[in-house]
Amino acid sequence: SPASQSLPRELSLSNDYELLQRFVPELEQLRIEEEDEDDTGSLQIEVLATFEWEEGHAPSETFGVSVLNGTQLIGVNCSGTFEESPCMGFAGDSAMGPILPVETNSVTVHIIVDHQIIESIFNNRTAMVTYATPSSETQTAVSLFGTTNLKSSSIQTWKLRDANNF
């Protein structure tokens, strides 16, 4: 089911009693060190992207991260046309949820891609699991999109090892 949780998460409460979630730190052990990497790309990758805009000036353009060479877009739409929140996070065409806290002027999205399964967590609050079919094993590019009107944006990526290679 698209709402399933396949990777372990650590749950906690914010000072305002909001449920927070993040991938468990043990998953970092799957990261491949840079000196061990080759440049062939990977269908198993971890992405940490941060976006910031001027306070009170939410961007009118959709922005976010493109994974699997554009097969899947994970991003934020701040058009303000949503009842739940001025900004909504989305993953592909099938998943959408509010960017919280509501008055924020930044978004951090943590993504783990495991072949066709893509898990995304926005601001340690809103999580989504989506599925995408890459056109080939070489279509692995990761990039930011829609960042021209933002104050700042950054991205970190790590290729990942197999967790259960029996």
Which positions does each model-derived feature cover?
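Beta-rich accessory regions
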Residues: 1-166
